UniProtKB/Swiss-Prot annotation:
SUPFAM superfamilies per the UniProt record, alphabetical: BRCT domain, DNA ligase/mRNA capping enzyme, catalytic domain, Nucleic acid-binding proteins, RuvA domain 2-like
Similarity comment text for this entry: Belongs to the NAD-dependent DNA ligase family. LigA subfamily.
Record-listed E.C. numbers: 6.5.1.2
Cofactor section: Mg(2+); Mn(2+)
Catalytically driven reaction(s): NAD(+) + (deoxyribonucleotide)n-3'-hydroxyl + 5'-phospho-(deoxyribonucleotide)m = (deoxyribonucleotide)n+m + AMP + beta-nicotinamide D-nucleotide
Gene from which the chain derives: ligA
Name of this chain's protein: DNA ligase
Biological role stated in the UniProt entry: DNA ligase that catalyzes the formation of phosphodiester linkages between 5'-phosphoryl and 3'-hydroxyl groups in double-stranded DNA using NAD as a coenzyme and as the energy source for the reaction. It is essential for DNA replication and repair of damaged DNA.
Region (Disordered): 1-23
Superkingdom of the source species: Bacteria
Species this protein is from: Sorangium cellulosum (strain So ce56)
Record: residues binding NAD(+): 52-56, 95-96, 169, 203, 330
Domain (BRCT) ranges: 593-676
């Protein structure tokens, strides 16, 4: 088995070596190497020109063409351009090899075992012969895992229990001394009980909550953290956090588990960790990919998997300053470089005209991607994107493809349209967006109906049916939904009477609509369900009171503000005729019940559920309960699919003593409190 592995590897290297000498590929290899060096230099100088994903994609392409290329063996950048004082690391800060699949992780474990067997330190887990004294059966059963933080690596030095130095990773040998800024960051103890000299390694990050609160409009926490960490005036550094993961010198600590525990005892914050077998690591990786990662307040791009024993790590050694006993198990990066063949502009349900890049097909996360969103017209200008450009395309959360950046500029910048692609009405510019304001535009009508259906939680109504009733001219505003007949729906393509009856019965079952739901269903910009609840709790318990309210009056409500108040008043006045028609037809909203089985109780929903969020919200509010948007000390119940979940909301809820329940538990709670 081992010999076959080496033979396969030799064959692959021979094939790839042939690619490296093929004239057709030689130019591309040289171009990739030059660009990788350039981007690596800018990355370690603190002003990256492309994202980590784009850099990884270029490295992967070079590795496929020439796996032995010297550029791939380098760590950091040799060309630091900085005005900060340079400082040398006593122990160089290296990097990690990466794996991006479960098979590659298993391959890494197998290689570790092979090395130990070859050097006489293990039996590879075969049990073929009695182990020699002190030998290792296999590393597979003794692995340690930590979150791989997507931040700025740093060495922090303490002497006599005091913080004395903080040096960025730089090129691995030399970094920049930014001690004054690091001292202001969260997670940095100014004093520790260890009185000798101590060098610890950590990562500067910007928590997503801090980014939202202190740097509105910023989209890259890593870039913002890098900028704040190296500002000469230190501004913004206080909002950054440092999480620690390593001790660099002199301590006789036997395992990674003990190392992290010791760091925590000293007062250093660390990323979350786990210990187990390779099977446990794979399960944890899957959980992070599907659930845990999305619930974190900071960005990670994978897990770091260590052989837990530091003695065994030492036996495994390192290659090119990369330890063999640890590996970065990166989340499969659903991003690839491709070429833009066209740019198309689509009018969405809100009236926003969104640019879409039509690209050369690429396989991403199991899907063949030909279209990728460009967000808005301002982003087109910011990217400077045009037809012919080489771009990095990703599938965020393995769902929507986006153009993340221009990797190589080749064509003229795209020019946005001046009229709506659907109805040809003139477009208006509002901030970053191009908007169609034609109320008769088919795209906007569909959008208003979609919003109404989603807000009231009418599960039977799918996208296709909404498109059909709008295209047939049967529906132009929400009131028209309540005028439909079984026959009018059944006559539509592939619709039957049974399906039509279900759709209409569901509409009626949602009546009467709670006032917050009614207001949110109108789809007025800035008028989400939480804002609607805020208004009702402030005493605006009827639609008539709200229609009579002025901007100044609403702006005085805590948590609302002048801008949102103005948007609400404008939106209500613009839709007053439509609201009047709904009221005249008997679709009159009611204030949430002051009494009911859930009166005085608060609920928050998280994760995917068996029923739409709107339906669950309606259930709680019609039973007298209140729905909160986040976990607070005020929350009574967190409704979640798995009450044993370790998501951030679940953890926070347990901390506050909030009870975690399932949707079935919610139904039982209502029945019990009704006395049924």
């Amino acid at each position: 088995m081992t010999q076959a592995h080496h033979d396969d590897a030799g064959a692959r290297n021979a094939l790839q070596g042939g690619l490296a000498t093929d004239p057709k590929h030689k130019a591309r290899i040289e171009e990739l190497a030059e660009r990788i060096e350039k981007y690596r230099a800018s990355y370690y100088a603190g002003h990256p020109e492309i994202s980590d994903a784009a850099f990884d994609a270029l490295e992967d392409e070079l590795r496929a063409l020439d796996p032995a290329h010297p550029v791939l063996a380098r760590v950091g950048s040799a060309s630091l351009i900085t005005e900060w004082e340079k400082a040398r690391h006593e122990i160089p800060m290296g990097s990690l090899n990466k794996v991006v699949s479960e098979d590659e992780l298993l391959g890494w474990v197998a290689r570790c075992d092979e090395i130990l067997v070859k050097d006489g330190h293990g039996d590879g887990g075969t049990g073929a012969a009695p182990p020699a004294p002190g030998s290792i059966s296999s590393v597979a059963g003794d692995l340690f895992v930590a979150e791989k933080l997507d931040g700025i690596s740093i060495e922090v030095i303490y002497k006599g229990g005091k913080l004395v130095d903080a040096i960025t990773r730089g090129d691995g040998e030399w970094g920049e001394r930014i001690t004054a800024n690091v001292a202001r960051m969260k997670g940095i103890p100014s004093r520790i009980r260890e009185k000798g000299r101590l060098s610890v390694r950590g990562e500067i990050i910007l928590r997503l909550s801090d980014m939202k609160r202190h740097f509105p409009g910023v989209t890259s926490p890593r870039n913002m953290a890098a900028g704040a960490a190296k500002r000469f005036d230190g501004q913004g550094a206080e909002h950054c956090t440092v999480l620690f993961y390593d001790v660099a010198d002199h301590l006789e600590i036997p395992t990674c588990r003990a190392r992290f525990a010791w760091l925590r005892e000293l007062g250093f914050a660390t990323p979350q960790t786990a210990h187990g077998s390779v099977e446990d690591v794979v399960k944890l990786y899957r959980r992070y990919s599907s659930e845990l990662r999305a619930g974190l307040d900071y960005e990670i791009d994978g897990l770091v998997v260590y052989v837990d024993s530091l003695h065994v790590q030492g036996l495994l050694g390192d290659v090119n300053r990369r330890p063999r006993g640890a590996v970065a198990f990166k989340f499969a990066s659903p991003a690839k470089v491709t070429t833009v063949v066209a740019i198309q502009w689509d009018t969405g349900p809100s009236g926003r005209v969104t640019p879409v890049a039509i690209v050369e097909p690429v396989e991403l996360a199991g899907a063949n991607v030909r279209r990728a969103s460009l967000h808005n017209s301002a982003n087109v200008r910011s990217l400077g994107i045009g037809v012919g450009d080489e771009v990095l395309v990703s599938r965020r959360n393995d769902v929507i493809p986006y153009v993340e950046e221009v990797v190589e500029k080749r064509g003229p910048v795209a020019v946005p349209p001046s009229v709506c692609p659907v109805c040809s009405a003139p477009l208006v510019v509002e901030g970053e967006y191009l908007l169609c304001r034609n109320a008769a535009c088919r795209a906007l009508i569909e959008g208003r109906i979609h919003n109404w259906i989603d807000a009231i939680g009418a599960l039977e109504w799918g996208d296709k049916l909404i498109e059909q009733v709008v295209a047939a001219g049967l529906v132009r505003e929400p009131l028209d939904l309540y005028k439909l007949t079984v026959k009018s729906i059944a006559d539509l393509d592939r619709r039957g009477e049974k399906s039509a009856t279900k759709c209409l019965e569901q509409l009626k079952s949602r009546l009467p609509l709670a006032l917050p739901v009614f207001l949110a269903a109108l789809g007025i910009e800035g008028f989400a369900i939480q804002t609607a609840r805020l208004l009702v709790s402030a005493g605006y318990t009827t639609i008539e009171k709200l229609l009579a309210a002025g901007e100044d009056e609403l702006a005085g409500i805590p948590g609302l503000g002048a801008i949102k108040a103005a948007s609400i008043v404008r939106g209500l006045r613009a839709r007053s005729d439509e609201i009047g028609r709904l009221l005249a037809a008997g679709i009159v909203p009611v204030a949430p019940e002051a009494e009911g089985p859930l009166a005085g109780l608060t609920f928050c929903f998280t994760g995917a559920g068996a029923r739409p969020r709107g339906e669950l919200t309606h259930l709680v509010e019609s039973s007298g309960g209140r729905v909160l948007n986040s976990v607070t000390k005020e929350l009574n119940y967190l409704v979640i699919a798995d009450v044993a979940s370790t998501s951030s909301k679940a953890v926070k809820a347990r901390k506050y003593g909030t009870k975690l329940i399932t949707e079935d538990d919610l139904d039982k709670l209502i029945a019990e409190r009704r006395g049924g």
